[in-house]
Amino acid sequence: MYAIIKTGGKQYKVAEGDSVFVEKLDAEEGSSVTFDEVILVANGDDVKVGTPLVDGAKVTAKVEKQGKEKKVVTFKYKPKKHSHSKYGHRQPYTKVTVEKIEA
């Protein structure tokens, strides 16, 4: 059984027991979160596609870790002008483990 959920403006295909890195959620480590925006639920040949969401479906997950990804560095310059700038960015993420899919 698997589901496609929407969180943080992205879609993720998840199954029970999967660990997924999603955009930062406002939840503490060890707590439980529920994803209500379920787009698709499949159990073998039984597939439920939402229009746009599946009614009554939800995915429960446990927050494993809060962290930041590796640094992404951007460098801009203008030739012959002695002008340059260097920026760094680390995107925060939340690692969740899917516990239960209800449809």
UniProtKB/Swiss-Prot annotation:
Signal peptide: none annotated. Keywords: Ribonucleoprotein, Ribosomal protein, RNA-binding, rRNA-binding. GO terms for biological process: translation. GO terms for cellular component: cytoplasm; ribonucleoprotein complex; ribosome. GO terms for molecular function: rRNA binding; structural constituent of ribosome. The keyword Magnesium does not apply. It holds the Pfam family Ribosomal_L21p. Belongs to the bacterial ribosomal protein bL21 family. This protein binds to 23S rRNA in the presence of protein L20. Part of the 50S ribosomal subunit. Contacts protein L20. This is Large ribosomal subunit protein bL21. It comes from Lactobacillus helveticus (strain DPC 4571). The gene is rplU.
